[in-house]
Amino acid sequence: MNFNATLFGQTVAFILFVWFCMKFVWPPLMNAIEERQKKIADGLADAGRAAKDLELAQIKATEQLKEAKVTANEIIEQANKRKAQIVEEAKVEAQTERAKIIAQGQAEIENERNRVKDDLRKQVALLAIAGAEKILERTIDPEAHSDIVNKLVAEI
């Protein structure tokens, strides 16, 4: 057995094996590793961007919520002002209507009072004439009667 030839054969076989691996096995493995590294790096970058996007979205949502609250408060304030304005207008309108109704009532009362006074004057005049007729025991003619009633009404 020749130790040198075996060693030389094994060395040649090992060199061929290394060359074959370097030529055909190693490049696909390196490409697969590089692709995996790239995917991992892209995934980490995407995760970082997603975290930043999430943070920005949360900030934006918080700002929109604050704006919505401010807008809601403004709308409520406007509604309260409008409510107060409507109530005030209703009060003014009610006061005007009240004054109008009171004025109408007072005018009706005054008209009724004047009518009653006139009726009362006529009745008093008739009673006075009736009393005078009894006192005088004579009847006054209708023309004189009307004249006397009108004079008494005017005096009363």
Curated annotation (Swiss-Prot):
It comes from Shewanella frigidimarina (strain NCIMB 400). One of its GO terms (cellular component) is plasma membrane. It holds the Pfam family ATP-synt_B. GO terms for molecular function: proton-transporting ATP synthase activity, rotational mechanism; proton-transporting ATPase activity, rotational mechanism. Its main location: membrane. The chain crosses the membrane at residues 7-29. It is found in: Cell inner membrane. F-type ATPases have 2 components, F(1) - the catalytic core - and F(0) - the membrane proton channel. F(1) has five subunits: alpha(3), beta(3), gamma(1), delta(1), epsilon(1). F(0) has three main subunits: a(1), b(2) and c(10-14). The alpha and beta chains form an alternating ring which encloses part of the gamma chain. F(1) is attached to F(0) by a central stalk formed by the gamma and epsilon chains, while a peripheral stalk is formed by the delta and b chains. F(1)F(0) ATP synthase produces ATP from ADP in the presence of a proton or sodium gradient. F-type ATPases consist of two structural domains, F(1) containing the extramembraneous catalytic core and F(0) containing the membrane proton channel, linked together by a central stalk and a peripheral stalk. During catalysis, ATP synthesis in the catalytic domain of F(1) is coupled via a rotary mechanism of the central stalk subunits to proton translocation. Component of the F(0) channel, it forms part of the peripheral stalk, linking F(1) to F(0). This is ATP synthase subunit b. It comes from the Bacteria. Belongs to the ATPase B chain family. It is a single-pass membrane protein. Gene3D superfamilies: F1F0 ATP synthase subunit B, membrane domain.
